[in-house]
Swiss-Prot record:
Anthranilate 1 binds at G80, N111. This is Anthranilate phosphoribosyltransferase. Homodimer. InterPro entries: Anthranilate_Pribosyl_Tfrase, Glycosyl_Trfase_fam3, Glycosyl_Trfase_fam3_N_dom, Glycosyl_Trfase_fam3_N_dom_sf, Nuc_phospho_transferase. SUPFAM superfamilies: Nucleoside phosphorylase/phosphoribosyltransferase catalytic domain, Nucleoside phosphorylase/phosphoribosyltransferase N-terminal domain. Binds 2 magnesium ions per monomer. It comes from the Bacteria. NCBIfam families: trpD. Belongs to the anthranilate phosphoribosyltransferase family. GO terms for cellular component: cytosol. Its EC number is 2.4.2.18. It catalyses: N-(5-phospho-beta-D-ribosyl)anthranilate + diphosphate = 5-phospho-alpha-D-ribose 1-diphosphate + anthranilate.
C-alpha cells in the first residue's frame, strides 16, 4: 500500500531511491488510483523532489520501458529539459548530429516540442527519420550511422497512466524532470541542459545516482543548453567527483551573439535553419551555438582534449557537410525496417 509512503511525504520527509522506484513502477503499470497519484505528485512537488526520488522514478521508467539492446560500446545522449520559455532553434538535436559526425555514438531520446515550436522528434521526422521504428532498427542506426533517435512514446507507453492527472493538475510535476533521464538505451555519457539554475546541482547528483560514467549538467543564462549570449553554469560528473564551473563562448574559441540571434520557427523553418547549419551554410550565431554544445559533448566523450578543440572539430565537420550525411544515413536505416 502507498498510504505509509504518502504519510512520509505529508510530513515533509523524503522517500528513498528504492521506495520511489517501487512507487513509480506501480504508477507506470497502471496500479495507482488517480486521486492517490494526484496526492503523491502534489506532495512531492510541495516538499521538493530530491535527487534520490528523481533517480528512483527514472529507474522505474527505464525498467518498465520497451526493451532495446544496450551496446557494449560507450555512447551518449544530449538533451534539454525544455520549459525555458525561449523559442530557440533545435540546438541539442543539431549538436547530437554534429557530434555523431565527429565519431561520438549518440542515441538521442526525445519527444515532440515542450518549450520551442519544434521539438527533437519534429526535427528528426522532418529529416526523414521514422519515429516509430523498432528498437532493433534504432540499434542498427546507432551501429551503422553513429546516430539513432528513440521516440519517447514508443518506449514509455506506461506514461499514459499518469496523463489524466498531469493534465488536470496543470502544473509541473516530477514527470517534467524525467524526460532527459529515461533514455531506454541507458547511455554511458550524458549532457543535460536544465531550464533553471537551481536544477543544475540536483540533476548532477541524480545522474551520479543513476551511474553514468561521465556527464555534464548545464544552464546557459536562461537556456537549457550552453549559451552563446552569456555565461553558462556547468557541473561535470566523473564517477564520484562533481566539478562545478562556468563556461563562456570564449572557452570554445567562439564569439558571443545575442539570444535573439538563435530564435527558431515552426518545424519546416527549423528544419531549413538546421539543415543549413549541418551543411556548413548556417547563420553564424546558429553555427556557434551548435558548435559550442557539440564541442562540449565531443570533449565529454573523450574525442577532444579541450572545449576549444571540440568546437573546432564540430565546425570542421559542418563545413565538410558530414553532419548532413550522418542524419541522412541514419534516416535511411530507420526507413529500411518494417513498422513495429
Amino acid at each position: 500500500m502507498l498510504f505509509p509512503l504518502l504519510e512520509t511525504l505529508y510530513q515533509g520527509k523524503a522517500l528513498s531511491q528504492n521506495e520511489t522506484t517501487d512507487v513509480f513502477s506501480q504508477i507506470v503499470t497502471g496500479q495507482v488510483d488517480n486521486i492517490i497519484l494526484s496526492s503523491l505528485l502534489t506532495a512531492l512537488k510541495i516538499k521538493g523532489e530530491t535527487p534520490e526520488e528523481i533517480a528512483g522514478a527514472a529507474t522505474a521508467m527505464i525498467q518498465n520501458a520497451s526493451p532495446v539492446k544496450r551496446p557494449e560500446y560507450d555512447f551518449a545522449d544530449i538533451v534539454g529539459t525544455g520549459g525555458d520559455g525561449h523559442n530557440t532553434i533545435n540546438i541539442s538535436s543539431a549538436a547530437a548530429i554534429v557530434a555523431a559526425s565527429c565519431g561520438v555514438k549518440v542515441a538521442k531520446h526525445g519527444n515532440r516540442s515542450v518549450s520551442s515550436k519544434s521539438g527533437s522528434a519534429d526535427l528528426f521526422n522532418a529529416f526523414g527519420m521514422k519515429l516509430d521504428m523498432s528498437p532493433a532498427a534504432a540499434r542498427e542506426c546507432l551501429d551503422k550511422a553513429n546516430l539513432c533517435f528513440l521516440f519517447a512514446p514508443v518506449y514509455h507507453a506506461g506514461i499514459k497512466h499518469a496523463m489524466p492527472v498531469r493534465t488536470t493538475l496543470k502544473t509541473r510535476t516530477i514527470f517534467n524532470l524525467l524526460g532527459p533521464l529515461v533514455n531506454p538505451m541507458q547511455p554511458s555519457h550524458m549532457m543535460i541542459g536544465v531550464y533553471a539554475p537551481e536544477l543544475v546541482m540536483p540533476f548532477a547528483r541524480t545522474l551520479q545516482l543513476l551511474g553514468y560514467k561521465k556527464a555534464l549538467v548545464v544552464h546557459g543564462s536562461g537556456l537549457d543548453e550552453l549559451a552563446v549570449h552569456g555565461p553558462s553554469m556547468v557541473v561535470e560528473i566523473d564517477g564520484d567527483a562533481l566539478n562545478e564551473y562556468t563556461l563562456s563562448p570564449s572557452d570554445f574559441g567562439l564569439e558571443e551573439y545575442p539570444l535573439a540571434a538563435i530564435e527558431g520557427g515552426v518545424p519546416d523553418e527549423n528544419k531549413q535553419l538546421i539543415q543549413d547549419v549541418l551543411a556548413g551554410e548556417g547563420q553564424a550565431a546558429h553555427e556557434a551555438a551548435v558548435a559550442m554544445n557539440a564541442g562540449a559533448l565531443i570533449k565529454l566523450c573523450g574525442r577532444a582534449e579541450t572545449y576549444q578543440q571540440g568546437a573546432k572539430m564540430a565546425i570542421d565537420a559542418m563545413q565538410a557537410k558530414r553532419p548532413l550525411q550522418v542524419i541522412e544515413a541514419s534516416s535511411a536505416v530507420s526507413r529500411s525496417h518494417d513498422i513495429i
